[in-house]
């Protein structure tokens, strides 16, 4: 069966053979290393959803587009999910209270890697920042063409407690209710 696995690219698919438990992952899961999520084509939120979807299939073997066959499929998918969670923690930690660029964050987070990988690493960091922004945990500010990111505390609607994004005080439903009162 064809399984939509957007994230690496918007139109990425994998193929699952139920009878044998074989999952052909293309670029979503590799035999070694991790897949690059490069915005705007790459979408980390969609990618994580795709990894969970592939895990729910309970494959036995992964046949990646690059690298060796993966015989411990569930362990590899868990490794990918854990890696992204670890990297997100590093991004938030590196942001701290500062306002920083993806390049500055990548230089710190990937300090143990050769400098020539930092440019691509900055793209991966950007994917995490975009995800964090969508979740209301980071914000982007642009001043005179300089784009910087900051961590923000998750906020809740002052009326109902639902999560809200950015610096608003009320969620959309409560805003409408207040206007109708």
Q: Residue ranges of each PLM-predicted region?
A:
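Metallo-beta-lactamase
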Residues: 1-88
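Structural motif
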Residues: 18, 141-144, 165
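C-terminal regulatory/interaction regions
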Residues: 93-154
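Short metal-coordination and nucleic-acid-contact micro-motifs, chiefly zinc-binding Cys/His arrays
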Residues: 153-156, 167
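Short Cys/His-rich micro-motifs in 6-15 aa windows
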Residues: 174-181
